[in-house]
Amino acid sequence: MPLFNMHQIRGQLGRDQRLLGLDPGQKTIGLALSDVSLMLASPYGALRRGKLSVVAAEIRRIAAREGVGGLVSGLPLSMDGSFGPAAQAARDWMISLSEQVGLPAAMWDERLSSSAVNRMLIQDADMTRQRRAELVDKLAASYMLQGALDATAE
């Protein structure tokens, strides 16, 4: 299944369907869920990153339970905006995941999403390192998905 842009994904969603945002890290995948009006992204949880088939099965379960009609994954562009090896690996992973889950997918620039979330948790929430580690993945997914929703709002 090819990747789509955010406008195409929004156009493919059925009535009352949501988007599931993914922030894939080395150890975990942060998850965020949009509301059905596609205006608000909320942190949803995190999955342990492992075999693609296991991750895909869990995302299929979440999608069925939550009425998800599309996936949006973070795209780790280089700081200068170029498409480097990390972005290519993320793109390849997302195409494979989309095919296994059976949902259309888009990617969205995630540069500095984890940094922004960490900074907020340190400065504004005054959280410990351990508590930040528990939250950062799903909050980064929410931050990324909210950016995608805001940029493509109609």
UniProtKB/Swiss-Prot annotation:
The EC number(s) attached to this protein equal 3.1.-.-
Similarity field: Belongs to the YqgF nuclease family.
Gene Ontology cellular-component annotations: cytosol
- Any idea what this protein is called? Putative pre-16S rRNA nuclease
- Record has NADP as a keyword: no
Annotated CDD domains: YqgF
Q: Any idea what job this protein has?
A: Could be a nuclease involved in processing of the 5'-end of pre-16S rRNA.
Q: InterPro entries of this UniProt entry?
A: RNaseH-like_sf, YqgF, YqgF/RNaseH-like_dom, YqgF/RNaseH-like_dom_sf
> In which organism is this protein found?
Gluconacetobacter diazotrophicus (strain ATCC 49037 / DSM 5601 / CCUG 37298 / CIP 103539 / LMG 7603 / PAl5)
Q: Which GO terms describe its biological process?
A: rRNA 5'-end processing
List locations, semicolon-separated.
Answer: Cytoplasm
Cysteine-cysteine disulfides: none
List keywords of the entry alphabetically: Cytoplasm, Hydrolase, Nuclease, Ribosome biogenesis
Alphabetical list of NCBIfam families matching this protein: RNAse_H_YqgF
Classification via PANTHER family: POLYNUCLEOTIDYL TRANSFERASE, RIBONUCLEASE H-LIKE SUPERFAMILY PROTEIN (PTHR33317:SF4)
Annotated Gene Ontology MF terms?
nuclease activity
